[in-house]
UniProtKB/Swiss-Prot annotation:
<dbReference type="GO" id="GO:0022625">
    <property type="term" value="C:cytosolic large ribosomal subunit"/>
</dbReference>
<dbReference type="InterPro" id="IPR018264">
    <property type="entry name" value="Ribosomal_bL33_CS"/>
</dbReference>
<dbReference type="InterPro" id="IPR038584">
    <property type="entry name" value="Ribosomal_bL33_sf"/>
</dbReference>
<dbReference type="Pfam" id="PF00471">
    <property type="entry name" value="Ribosomal_L33"/>
</dbReference>
<dbReference type="InterPro" id="IPR001705">
    <property type="entry name" value="Ribosomal_bL33"/>
</dbReference>
<comment type="similarity">
    <text>Belongs to the bacterial ribosomal protein bL33 family.</text>
</comment>
<keyword id="KW-0689">Ribosomal protein</keyword>
<keyword id="KW-0687">Ribonucleoprotein</keyword>
<dbReference type="InterPro" id="IPR011332">
    <property type="entry name" value="Ribosomal_zn-bd"/>
</dbReference>
<dbReference type="GO" id="GO:0006412">
    <property type="term" value="P:translation"/>
</dbReference>
<dbReference type="GO" id="GO:0003735">
    <property type="term" value="F:structural constituent of ribosome"/>
</dbReference>
<protein>
    <recommendedName>
        <fullName>Large ribosomal subunit protein bL33</fullName>
    </recommendedName>
</protein>
Length: 54
């Protein structure tokens, strides 16, 4: 079988206030820079900024 090399890669989003992480996918072509999203952090129990890590 041929392997499929797509534009989607799996990334980790790490909280700026605690050690909590989310995993998600992003499209390399549409978002070449690092993602920053506001998501819910269950450790501090509020929405905080999450940044993409390697």
């Amino acid at each position: 079988m041929a392997s499929k090399k797509g534009n989607r890669i799996v990334i980790k989003l790490k909280s700026t206030e605690s050690g909590h992480t989310y995993t998600t996918e992003k499209n390399r072509r549409n978002d070449p820079s690092r993602l920053e999203l506001r998501k819910y952090d269950p450790i501090v129990r509020r929405h905080v900024l999450y940044r993409e890590t390697k």
